[in-house]
Curated annotation (Swiss-Prot):
The gene is rmt2. Residues 73-88 have a biased composition (Polar residues). S-adenosyl-L-methionine-dependent protein-arginine N-methyltransferase that methylates the delta-nitrogen atom of arginine residues to form N5-methylarginine (type IV) in target proteins. Monomethylates ribosomal protein L12. Residues 207-426 form the RMT2 domain. GO terms for molecular function: protein arginine N5-methyltransferase activity. It comes from Emericella nidulans (strain FGSC A4 / ATCC 38163 / CBS 112.46 / NRRL 194 / M139). This is Protein arginine N-methyltransferase 2. Residues 155-168 have a biased composition (Acidic residues). Coiled coil: none annotated. Residues 65-88, 155-175 are annotated as: Disordered.
Amino acid sequence: MANPVTEIDVDLNTQEVLLAASQHDTAKLRRLLRANDAAGNPANVKDPETGYSPLHAAIAACEPDEEEDVKSNGVQTNGDRQTHGQESTVEAAVQTVKLLLQEGAIWNDLDLNNETPGCIARRLGLTELYDMVVDAGVRAELLLNRLDGYEQLSDEEMEEDGEQEQEQQDAAVAADASITNTAEDESVPQLVDTTAAAPPQTADAEPSVTSSRYLNSDLTFQQDRLLDQDQNGVMMAWESDIMAKSAKQLLPTPGLRVLNVGHGMGIVDGFIQEQSPSAHHIIEAHPAVVAEMKRKGWHEKPGVVIHEGKWQDILPGLVAEGVMFDAIYYDTFAESYADFREFFTEQVIGVLEQEGKWSFFNGMGADRQISYDVYQKVVEMDLFEAGFDVEWEEIDVPKLEGEWNGVRRPYWSIDKYRLPLCKYMD
């Protein structure tokens, strides 16, 4: 039987940590974190009423009281929060956030309002704090990437198995702690956790989106969307403007040779055709999509070559044949970031001309702005390491109210799409 006194002590310890974080009392917070002998990382305790972690609390405490944010004439101010007597508070918060991240605070833990600490910082206009959380997320993903134990960067990142994720986090903490420099004469581990542990899977839990499940899934082709058997949106018509601009960026003149990996609804391939390529190769892995392509006569279009299968199996053959392209587009479904990174680190160099360009559908983390910002930096660094420069063009995303009716979950919720255009480094 649980000891009620112990339970009260644990709750009081949690509240002490949260209070010290919200008051930006780094000295007390450091003592509490180091002295805590409860199970789990005290930097990630949760307030049961708000779901706040210490990181949430430290950032949320920077929000001005309403009466402090209203001018004497009663007009609400809309300027930068940091210019209204908040400088000292924000500076204290910076030091608190720094400490918490060093102690292993989870950068994208969710509160009961479905906000991460970075979401709160962005909502309050706290740019410096937001950037700190973004950088922490980048460090976490890059480290887990190098450990070959990171989760896939996809729409499912918030819902990975909790036990597996915790093992990844523990391994990352141990690895990172061994290389952390001392600061202020105290050795502290830097952030490596990526998400809060998800609840255990139940018998009726939603199935994971994996490549093998998708490729064995029945598909539903509708006028404005393509869905798998679990009602996941594989591709939707609202992406058309993005695809049109991508095709024009990749194929500025007629007569170029292009490869598209992932046909889906055929949106980008339709726009590619409008650019009059001399050769248009398409790799498509799903048998139902291939059948739909043939039904629509894609195999009869001039210059079009359909490769049935996964790019992992098709591309080595094209390399062996010496087939080269001036442009490549990548837009697969249910593949992991590890697959994508293998594509541009191992495969692109074998089929892309020296002056060629390539792009991809940039939807990683698009369910919230901070995830999108983190994953953009991650892929940018990995592209650089693979020998590619990348330029980004921001495109307005149309209002998507009503678009998600009948779809398992929205995979896009931010206002701007960042279109990548990659080429070999000079």
